[in-house]
Amino acid sequence: MTTQVPPSALLPLNPEQLARLQAATTDLTPTQLAWVSGYFWGVLNQQPAALAATPAPAAEMPGITIISASQTGNARRVAEALRDDLLAAKLNVKLVNAGDYKFKQIASEKLLIVVTSTQGEGEPPEEAVALHKFLFSKKAPKLENTAFAVFSLGDSSYEFFCQSGKDFDSKLAELGGERLLDRVDADVEYQAAASEWRARVVDALKSRAPVAAPSQSVATGAVNEIHTSPYSKDAPLVASLSVNQKITGRNSEKDVRHIEIDLGDSGLRYQPGDALGVWYQNDPALVKELVELLWLKGDEPVTVEGKTLPLNEALQWHFELTVNTANIVENYATLTRSETLLPLVGDKAKLQHYAATTPIVDMVRFSPAQLDAEALINLLRPLTPRLYSIASSQAEVENEVHVTVGVVRYDVEGRARAGGASSFLADRVEEEGEVRVFIEHNDNFRLPANPQTPVIMIGPGTGIAPFRAFMQQRAADEAPGKNWLFFGNPHFTEDFLYQVEWQRYVKEGVLTRIDLAWSRDQKEKVYVQDKLREQGAELWRWINDGAHIYVCGDANRMAKDVEQALLEVIAEFGGMDTEAADEFLSELRVERRYQRDVY
């Protein structure tokens, strides 16, 4: 359990007091933290002065509700910044995570702002799935008294760019809501668009929302604030890589690395279920190849965020080189008048396919042109950190953080290519080398608060990572609840990630059951969803006993296939029709008994 606090400007504690509080709670288990929380709440409620100072409930006056639907933290940061802007304007505002929002109250909202990202094939973030499903169901209410605005974050390298925001925007209007502002669809480089949009939202709401008393605006504005740390995406910790171990066999088609990073005395804290953000540098050899293909030298001065840098340095540290997009292909075609690429312009499907199959450097190789350095920089997108599900618990590893990295490797016409962050960690950071990292907290993927609750973990491939953290935590807490793992990969002998650890947990009785699916070890392919169906009766018994279900891994295929298998198990062994099974699984999601970390 992580203490949740508002931004430093709103903290009632000074930095020294906050440090003492964090130090005092570092070694407490989730159960102990919950008790301490209750203890202080009891102390507070025994003090009449504290009660007298409590502001009136926000429900007594209408205000603004911001719903944050975030997958990687960007949407949450935009929502929090908007909340702070509205508080500064002395407006009554409430910020709530989509997963905590009681969506049946949406009909009573007068002023509603939705900030959402998109995942997978145009799907809403995990924490917003239940709200999305409700709004698109027959149960959705009319919203004639609701004015709304939507800010949508996405990645134009994907086909269904900002689809979740488009869905929310169109459905809220269809239900009778009034658009305060047109929807904004923001790409990876979203900050400028978000800043402009926030200013327009504040202006639009000043004339429509009541001004709150300072105590009320602060109290409601701090609702569901997530975490605080001296380190963040924009101010990462410079840590050191201590272990880089290949954990797939010599003959495996996959290169999977177990990476351990030493956090030193930074005090950086995380929980099982969180992700590690990794800032990486592009391969100097890739930078050199791209520069030479464009007949540049690499020492040309370019401007990056107001600073003048040599082109080589800018490309290595500041720009995305390993992920192509339809926009880049289209802009390069138009800029260079390429005879090969111009026929693709205007055809979205062909542009998407070309971008997905042709890295930027090979696009330039196949369609050579001469660009000046600034034109190249303007063509590219800013480099963004990669997120990896954390594979460790600090209850066991203390000042370390572990991740499980599937290294992306492929060939383009005989030339070896690799993923930016995965090859950085696997190939280019030496032992004790520097790695810039931060924690991306994920409160939508948490172990049950009750240690007696059974846990079902479904994680093929590198989706196994958070469940290693879960088991370390359950073992450290001596949690009596049962644990069941479903894992799959191509081959038993080559791809059984962390095999010795799982066998030890089984022997010690910590891991109650383990079901394994090896897709290439026999004639018929077997996947984790097949194992779920095979164990349907027992799975249903666990669910009836209150088990929490966790899924981690590929969003596009695996997660959908697993969900379909779960629906079939619920329908068959729960005696339900398809609609009732879907409703049952939706209720599990709302109750936080069905959680997914998919990508």
From Swiss-Prot:
Its EC number is 1.8.1.2. Residues 64-202 form the Flavodoxin-like domain. Binds 1 FAD per subunit. It catalyses: hydrogen sulfide + 3 NADP(+) + 3 H2O = sulfite + 3 NADPH + 4 H(+). Residues 234-448 form the FAD-binding FR-type domain. Pfam families: FAD_binding_1 (PF00667), Flavodoxin_1 (PF00258), NAD_binding_1 (PF00175). Its cofactor is FAD; FMN. One of its GO terms (biological process) is cysteine biosynthetic process. InterPro entries: CysJ, CysJ-like_FAD-binding, CysJ_Proteobact, FAD-bd_FR_type, Flavdoxin-like, Flavodoxin/NO_synth, Flavoprot_Pyr_Nucl_cyt_Rdtase, Flavoprotein-like_sf. GO terms for molecular function: flavin adenine dinucleotide binding; FMN binding; sulfite reductase (NADPH) activity. NADP(+) binds at residues 519-520, 525-529, 561. Pathway: Sulfur metabolism; hydrogen sulfide biosynthesis; hydrogen sulfide from sulfite (NADPH route): step 1/1. FMN binds at residues 70-75, 117-120, 153-162. Keywords: Amino-acid biosynthesis, Cysteine biosynthesis, Electron transport, FAD, Flavoprotein, FMN, NADP, Oxidoreductase, Transport. The keyword Transit peptide does not apply. GO terms for cellular component: cytosol. FAD binds at residues 322, 356, 386-389, 404-406, 410, 419-422, 599. PANTHER family: NADPH OXIDOREDUCTASE A, NITRIC OXIDE SYNTHASE-RELATED. Belongs to the NADPH-dependent sulphite reductase flavoprotein subunit CysJ family. In the N-terminal section; belongs to the flavodoxin family. Alpha(8)-beta(8). The alpha component is a flavoprotein, the beta component is a hemoprotein. Component of the sulfite reductase complex that catalyzes the 6-electron reduction of sulfite to sulfide. This is one of several activities required for the biosynthesis of L-cysteine from sulfate. The flavoprotein component catalyzes the electron flow from NADPH -> FAD -> FMN to the hemoprotein component. This is Sulfite reductase [NADPH] flavoprotein alpha-component. It comes from Shigella sonnei (strain Ss046). The gene is cysJ.
